[in-house]
């Protein structure tokens, strides 16, 4: 069975089962070869796919020498380190944040009202006051907070907000414009989720990876 036949069968399944799918598309190389929308085609919140864009940008920053996987969180923000900080806090690296093994071992900053600052008006101060429960690097725990901290490390290293850095390194290269991006209470784009994109634009990053890092 070819890709188009599989796509058509999937569309039929979505329709027959009334599955909560807004849109679906497949691409071959740089071209979309099949696309179907079940709601109006518009930019939508891509939620945790945002993490893929931020981690890609961090990879670019590492290649450019702005960061290292061994860069320590506390070195990026020494002013946020509590006077009674745990030894383990100083062991958290960018590598741990990207692999969600920071050691906080809790799904922080994932509550529905986090964008309004409920309970955490300053994400950095909030996370630096959390207890590191296990040794960094020892345990996987899915948490948007790890992504948010990694994003802030990128901002600090690049000297600009995430939106600016990603526009220069990714969005403009993929003809994605300047996407709407939800921010934290202090105006920093949320690295854990919140970019708005159309389906076609959302697909582009996957195409880049499938094409070994090239676009057109």
Sequence positions of predicted segments:
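Short, charged, amphipathic alpha-helices and their helix-cap/turn boundaries
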Residues: 31-32, 111-136, 160-179
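Flexible glycine/proline-enriched surface loops and loop-helix/loop-strand junctions
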Residues: 39, 132-135, 146-148, 184-190
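Short, positively charged
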Residues: 1-12, 62
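Active-site helix/loop module of the DD-peptidase/beta-lactamase fold
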Residues: 66-104, 129, 157-197
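Catalytic tyrosine of NAD(P)H-dependent dehydrogenase/reductases that use a Tyr as the general acid/base
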Residues: 47, 140-142
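Active-site-proximal alpha-helical segments within enzyme catalytic domains
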Residues: 149-153, 193-215
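A short, well-structured edge-of-sheet supersecondary motif
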Residues: 7-40, 69
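Active-site SXXK
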Residues: 30, 45-70, 97, 150-154, ...
């Amino acid at each position: 069975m070819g890709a188009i036949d599989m796509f058509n069968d999937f569309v039929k399944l979505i329709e027959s089962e009334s599955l909560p799918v807004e849109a679906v598309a497949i691409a071959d190389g740089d071209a979309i070869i099949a696309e179907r929308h079940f709601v109006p085609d518009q930019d939508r919140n891509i939620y945790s796919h945002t993490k893929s864009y931020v981690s890609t940008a961090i990879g670019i920053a590492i290649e450019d020498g702005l960061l290292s996987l061994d860069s320590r969180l506390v070195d990026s923000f020494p002013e946020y380190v509590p006077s009674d900080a745990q030894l383990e806090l100083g062991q958290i690296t960018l590598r741990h944040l990207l692999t969600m093994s920071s050691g906080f071992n809790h799904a922080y900053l994932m509550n529905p009202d986090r964008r309004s600052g409920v309970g955490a008006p300053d994400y950095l101060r909030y996370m630096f006051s959390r207890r590191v429960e296990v040794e960094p690097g020892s345990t996987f725990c899915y948490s948007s907070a790890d992504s948010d901290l990694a994003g802030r490390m990128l901002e600090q290293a690049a000297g600009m907000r995430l939106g600016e850095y990603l526009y220069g390194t990714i969005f403009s290269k993929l003809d994605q414009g300047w996407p709407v991006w939800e921010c934290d209470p202090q105006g920093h784009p949320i690295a854990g989720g919140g970019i708005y994109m159309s389906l076609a634009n959302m697909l582009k990053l996957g195409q880049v990876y499938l094409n070994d890092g090239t676009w057109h």
